[in-house]
């Protein structure tokens, strides 16, 4: 929503949330707390926030230039490697600042890189709904992200770190210079399998016109071992980003592949094939915060009283735009789980999307036995209805039928799929690991 400040006429962006449960409110407050630490020219900023019963509003600066990749495919835009360097440098600067605050973004992707205006080359990073504080290095594990850009350690439910964001930067850079995606499959499961294998190359002719420095930059980010990736400071010191661009040859790069990539990504989004793997807060286009205490007392920055009128006046005006309460609906699956075939020792993931209101309770079953969460079985159920069962380190005993059951006061719904586990013979696979890169 576009919001107009009554006193000054200044235009802001409004991000509206419906938060019915304590967990939903806490997730949004966590985003607010994190955004309060992030004040940098390459990060979108927030000026205030309001909370009233089940409604929370964040007031943010407007970033009006559109998504970076949409800008690139515009007929009036000339894409060169020099432009790619400018954008990747800004992304690295923004993420470097985030990491220096002890925070990981965890959802870096093209949609979250916005152009400040429709003519310049300045960008800002947005959407910190999945960001987390990295308080105890090596101990944080997460089960969310966007399949095409998520790092292998997330899929395998292994400890994450600042380098988890660096993998995503590598994927973004690969696509930016070539218009090709290193890991996108025909569906989420195929994409996640591609990421887990961490196999990719520069064999396509698209890379014939890309410099060796650019390829080296990408190669040092798309490393499966989290310890071997460049950090942001090293990225900014890399010969590719540190090179003077004024005298660089402005050779045009083909945008044909990028247009095809964007068209395919839009098509997959329409079919819910490309989506976040369980978002913890439902995010709109922009995020950030630098406001005042909410009505519940969650800590934020002091409010400049001259910027906005009284909380009662402004919040009332903002909250009038919030949608009516949702009608009650019996549970149903808009996306059902599918049969999987995995190799012993790898991870398996069943994904579905559950609709219904009041929000259905969910139980997973292995054959006829209910599943309890453990290190082996992880259940991820998010407020937008996306629900996942992740099975780590799959063994032969996991070969079974799995059922997801959703129940609310109006009824119930189930969907079932089979997991087939391929057991490896002794000695199979030894010495057969593919090299991670050239």
UniProtKB/Swiss-Prot annotation:
Annotated GO MF terms: actin binding; ATP binding; calmodulin binding; metal ion binding; myosin light chain kinase activity
Active site: 107
Region (Disordered): 289-309
Keywords (A to Z) from UniProt: Actin-binding, ATP-binding, Calcium, Calmodulin-binding, Cell projection, Cytoplasm, Cytoskeleton, Disulfide bond, Immunoglobulin domain, Kinase, Magnesium, Metal-binding, Nucleotide-binding, Phosphoprotein, Serine/threonine-protein kinase, Transferase
Annotated segments matching region Telokin: 283-438
GO cellular component: cleavage furrow; cytoplasm; lamellipodium; stress fiber
Modified residues annotated as Phosphotyrosine in this record: 97, 157
Post-translational modification note: The C-terminus is deglutamylated by AGTPBP1/CCP1, AGBL1/CCP4 and AGBL4/CCP6, leading to the formation of Myosin light chain kinase, smooth muscle, deglutamylated form. The consequences of C-terminal deglutamylation are unknown.
Every Ig-like C2-type domain range: 331-420
Phosphothreonine PTM sites in chain numbering: 300
Protein role: Calcium/calmodulin-dependent myosin light chain kinase implicated in smooth muscle contraction via phosphorylation of myosin light chains (MLC). Also regulates actin-myosin interaction through a non-kinase activity. Phosphorylates PTK2B/PYK2 and myosin light-chains. Involved in the inflammatory response (e.g. apoptosis, vascular permeability, leukocyte diapedesis), cell motility and morphology, airway hyperreactivity and other activities relevant to asthma. Required for tonic airway smooth muscle contraction that is necessary for physiological and asthmatic airway resistance.
Family, as annotated: Belongs to the protein kinase superfamily. CAMK Ser/Thr protein kinase family.
Protein name according to UniProt: Myosin light chain kinase, smooth muscle
Gene: MYLK
